[in-house]
C-alpha cells in the first residue's frame, strides 16, 4: 500500500505555520541521520569513518525499511479486522527494479532522506546507484506483474505477490577478444536489505 507519511506543505501557510513546517522537516532529517548512523554501527559493525558506500546504502535501506514495516503491518491488521478480501498474485517473475528511490517516492520521504544522507557527507546519487536490479525474471511477464502489484497498492487493494526467488534471474554480457561472453547476474552477492528470511515456513 502506498502511504504519504509526510505530505507536502501548503504554499499558502502563514509565516508561523511555515516555520513550524521547517522545524518539523529538520526534526525528521535529524531522526533519519541518527537512524542511519545507528545502522552503520549496529548492522555493519563498523566505525562510521570506516564505512564504505555499500555500508551506507545498506544502512539507508534498512532505515527506510523500518518505516515501511510499521505501515505495512498497520495496513495488514486493518484489512484483517475489516474482513477484506485479498488478492494473491502468482507469477514466475517479478521485475520490481530498484526499490530505494521507488519506496522513498511512495513514502514521500525522498527529500528528507536525500538531505540527511548529504548532510552526512555521502553523495546520494552514488549511494542510489549501489543498489542492483532485483534479478527476479528477465521478460515482459515480470514487468507486468510488478505493474499489477503497484496498481493494486495504489488502489489500496490488499494483495500479496508470490514468485520464485531466483539467485541468477538475469545475466550480464561482456565482449572479450571480439567474443560475447555471458555470466550469471550476482545481484545477491552483497545481500538484500529489503527481504525478510522466513526459514520457519520453507
Feature-to-residue mapping (PLM):
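A conserved ligand/cofactor-binding region detector
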Residues: 2-202
Amino acid at each position: 500500500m502506498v502511504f504519504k507519511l509526510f505530505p507536502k506543505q501548503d504554499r499558502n501557510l502563514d509565516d508561523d505555520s511555515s516555520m513550524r513546517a521547517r522545524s518539523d522537516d529538520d526534526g525528521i532529517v535529524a531522526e533519519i541521520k541518527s537512524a542511519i548512523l545507528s545502522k552503520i554501527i549496529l548492522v555493519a559493525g563498523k566505525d562510521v569513518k570506516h564505512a564504505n558506500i555499500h555500508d551506507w546504502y545498506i544502512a539507508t535501506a534498512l532505515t527506510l525499511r523500518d518505516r515501511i514495516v510499521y505501515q505495512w503491518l498497520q495496513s495488514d491488521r486493518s484489512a484483517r479486522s475489516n474482513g477484506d478480501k485479498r488478492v494473491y498474485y502468482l507469477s514466475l517473475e517479478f521485475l520490481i527494479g530498484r526499490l530505494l528511490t521507488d519506496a522513498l517516492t511512495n513514502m514521500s520521504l525522498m527529500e528528507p532522506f536525500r538531505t540527511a544522507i548529504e548532510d552526512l557527507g555521502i553523495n546520494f546519487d552514488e549511494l542510489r546507484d549501489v543498489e542492483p536490479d532485483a534479478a527476479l525474471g528477465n521478460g515482459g511477464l515480470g514487468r507486468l506483474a510488478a505493474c499489477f502489484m503497484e496498481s493494486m497498492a495504489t488502489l489500496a487493494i490488499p494483495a500479496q505477490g508470490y514468485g520464485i526467488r531466483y539467485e541468477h534471474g538475469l545475466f550480464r554480457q561482456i565482449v572479450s577478444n571480439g567474443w560475447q561472453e555471458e555470466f550469471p547476474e550476482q545481484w545477491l552477492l552483497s545481500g538484500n536489505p529489503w527481504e525478510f528470511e522466513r526459514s520457519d515456513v520453507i
